From Swiss-Prot:
Record keywords: DNA damage, DNA recombination, DNA repair
Protein name as catalogued: DNA repair protein RecO
Residues spanning the membrane: none
Organism classification: Bacteria, Pseudomonadati, Pseudomonadota, Alphaproteobacteria, Rickettsiales
Keyword DNA repair carried by entry: yes
GO cellular component terms attached to this protein's record: bacterial nucleoid
């Protein structure tokens, strides 16, 4: 069995002295793993977030298989000196590695992840909004879309200030004030991102509020369901 595709590196682990187990998020084949050979000059090629042209081959589809890779675009060197950006990229790559089903195409998420890498690489000031959008999209693509369009109790679309941790639905200030200590906040940044307003800039504290909300649902719907530990790097984004 053999196929060719483009893919983004989401994990790379040494296997012996001369091989690497590579995990790619590919455009048409989803998350795929395979062995690839290391050479003296190939380490730079296999950095998280780099874009590769990959040829995968194996006797059977369920085998680990082998990758032959050519570098299309190197990305990690653009932001590795920025601690927050590098942690964000590595963290999301780790999330994809842990929660994406094997061999199931997810072209919408792939295209958005590739676009996000370009956004963060070119120092777009709204990259944090694009990142929250990426986490919301991941939840949606895996079947856990949040409904933040209107109040779950009254149906109103104004003054949405809370999110129910049980349902992932928005709650208005009037309906939720009495239960505020049992609800998640609905930060303005996340409200704008949900409504596809991605060009605004916000404080880092506002970004962290958004991360707490999306992180809660990533953990609840994906990691706990898979019995997988939530990535420490993702938690680190809240303490920088």
């Amino acid at each position: 069995m053999r196929w060719k595709d483009e893919g983004i590196i989401i994990a790379a682990k040494k296997y012996g002295d001369k091989n690497l187990i590579l995990s790619l998020f590919t455009k048409n084949h989803g998350k795929r793993r395979g062995l690839t050979k290391l050479t003296n000059n190939s380490n730079y090629k296999f950095q998280i977030s780099n874009l590769l042209h990959a040829e995968w081959s194996a006797k059977l589809p369920e085998n680990l298989g082998f990758f032959k890779c050519e570098l299309i675009e190197s990305s990690f060197h653009h932001f590795f000196q920025d601690r927050l950006k590098s942690i964000t990229i590595v963290s999301f790559s780790s999330i994809l590695e842990k929660v994406l089903p094997e061999s199931e195409p997810c072209a919408v998420l792939y295209d958005n992840f590739r676009y996000f890498i370009d956004v963060i690489k070119h120092n777009n000031q709204s990259w944090q909004s694009h990142y929250l959008n990426l986490e919301l999209l991941l939840l949606t693509q895996l079947g856990f879309k949040l409904d933040l369009s209107k109040c779950a109790v009254t149906g109103v679309k104004e003054n949405l200030q809370f999110i129910s941790p049980k349902t992932g639905r928005a709650v208005s200030k009037k309906a939720g004030d009495y239960y505020a200590d049992k609800l998640l906040p609905f930060p303005q940044m996340l409200h704008d991102v949900y409504n596809n307003n991605l060009q605004n800039s916000y404080s880092f504290q506002e970004f962290q509020l958004g991360l707490k909300v999306t992180g809660y649902f990533l953990n609840k719907y994906l990691f706990l369901q898979l019995n997988v530990k939530f990535p420490e790097l993702r938690n680190l984004m809240l303490s920088l």
